[in-house]
């Protein structure tokens, strides 16, 4: 348990940031789930649309510090390859 006033404030801030980051991470996962559903269904148009929506959301998570840059790039690259494969 935090004892000093600054430690108590830090604990409050961490709690708020954790809630925000959890929401951001959840939002990214939702977009990825929609894309995954479109890919497994084999729906080309839905997959392309879902990818166009998911890619900026993933990169936004990077700028907000939720995902690491390389992790996001790897995810986007692999998803783009899968979308390209279904489109061909």
UniProtKB/Swiss-Prot annotation:
The annotated region (Disordered) lies at: 1-25
Cysteines joined through disulfide linkages: none
> What InterPro entries does the entry give?
Ribosomal_bS20, Ribosomal_bS20_sf
Tell me, what is an example of a GO biological process annotation in this record? Answer: translation
Pfam families, sorted? Ribosomal_S20p
The record's GO CC annotations read: cytosol; small ribosomal subunit
Q: Which GO terms describe its molecular function?
A: small ribosomal subunit rRNA binding; structural constituent of ribosome
Keywords, A to Z?
Ribonucleoprotein, Ribosomal protein, RNA-binding, rRNA-binding
- Family membership: Belongs to the bacterial ribosomal protein bS20 family.
| PANTHER family per record | 30S RIBOSOMAL PROTEIN S20, SMALL RIBOSOMAL SUBUNIT PROTEIN BS20C
Primary role: Binds directly to 16S ribosomal RNA.
Q: What is this protein called?
A: Small ribosomal subunit protein bS20
Organism field: Azorhizobium caulinodans (strain ATCC 43989 / DSM 5975 / JCM 20966 / LMG 6465 / NBRC 14845 / NCIMB 13405 / ORS 571)
């Amino acid at each position: 348990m935090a004892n000093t006033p600054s430690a108590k404030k830090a604990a409050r801030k961490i709690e708020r940031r954790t809630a925000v980051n959890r929401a951001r991470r959840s939002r990214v996962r939702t977009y990825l789930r929609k894309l995954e559903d479109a890919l497994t269904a084999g729906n080309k148009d839905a997959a392309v649309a879902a990818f166009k929506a998911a890619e900026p959301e993933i990169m936004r998570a990077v700028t907000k510090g939720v995902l690491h840059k390389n992790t996001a790039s790897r995810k986007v690259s692999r998803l783009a390859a899968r979308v390209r494969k279904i489109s061909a």
